[in-house]
Swiss-Prot record:
Residues 3-40 are annotated as: Interaction with DNA. Belongs to the CcdA antitoxin family. This is Antitoxin CcdA. The lineage of its organism: Bacteria, Pseudomonadati, Pseudomonadota, Gammaproteobacteria, Enterobacterales. The keyword Signal does not apply. It comes from the Bacteria. The gene is ccdA.
């Protein structure tokens, strides 16, 4: 679902993008999606940092389950 918002932008940038027929709404939407994805990944990493450290310690002590299948 889309939501209408109002943003304030630099006039020169707006005019240039408009002159090149850039879909400004699409550009803003894509930029917002990318930032939301980055923020979710950052939050996930913070929430799971302890678990990832525990897995790293386990692998350090016991090796990886894939070690026996490595050919390199």
């Amino acid at each position: 679902m889309k939501q209408r918002i109002t943003v304030t932008v630099d006039s020169d940038s707006y005019q240039l993008l408009k002159a090149y027929d850039v879909n400004i709404s699409g550009l803003v939407s894509t930029t917002m999606q990318n930032e939301a994805r980055r923020l979710r990944a950052e939050r996930w990493k913070a929430e799971n940092q302890e678990g990832m450290a525990e897995v790293a310690r386990f692998i350090e002590m016991n090796g990886s389950f894939a070690d026996e299948n490595r050919d390199w």
